[in-house]
């Protein structure tokens, strides 16, 4: 797998980056006519690929690759946070490119609307959208030839991917999270396009849940998770539809993303490092939740179970593991300087982190 990953990254940053600015060119996940530029989601996931490759290179003991990939990941992260960010809008842009690309993208949006109208899809809302893009085209015509910057044409949900991935600065993240919730969200989560304000999809709501979780906003993340739960089994028992609440494919593997990932990685706070037989755990219970429990969670060649329960004496944490040779770091905010009971022994915490080993661990954080 690793050799193919290296080939893929090389392809992204050479053949797909003809101007050498580290923003790969081409269509991203959005299926929008004409939106063929340097898109924010592609740039973000390219940055994530570089970061992951730097860690993989360490495992495969390549002497120069870890530093090379890590440096490129850091540069791309900074470029995304500067060149894609529009401070006046308080948002990351749809794409980065030239005024000519912005005009072509807008014309593509108009053509897509006209195709729908010709097919008999006409409504006052569509007419309003058509007028918006025509006015945008007039506005774009005022820019000098060759102007290069970040552009908004659709305000697609992928503007949240820098937050989902955790590479946004905190101030930018909080500002955009609040904006999306207030201005871009419908009944079941973010609109695919905040300009069109029509369709919502499970993937967009999932990304928004993960974005909220990435910046410690547990209750806000669970608000989006609940929107996905509301669509559960609408079309097919035990499944979540692609388009919310009940349209599109009734079964797609990624529709579980917005349920499983926020819960496992944020509420339970489980972060695996399977290669090193290590797991970090930092739970975040939503408001009003007194207990959580997850059983038989596969992690590498191991299986763990983890539970948190608030009691009259304090909060109990129970961790069991199939393997005895794994190591765990349990992080509890505000633990430093307080007493806790670990496997029957009363101790005083020197930090917020507790190291755990073995197959069974029981910890009581004394209130």
Q: What is each model feature region?
A:
Residues 20-22:
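Acidic, glycine-anchored loop motifs typical of Ca2+
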Residues 72, 76, 329-331:
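Short, 15-30-residue, compositionally biased linear elements
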Residues 13, 17, 58, 78-81, ...:
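Helix-capping and short linker residues that terminate individual alpha-solenoid repeat units
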Residues 2-6, 10, 37-44, 48-59, ...:
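Active-site core of glycosidic bond-cleaving carbohydrate-active enzymes
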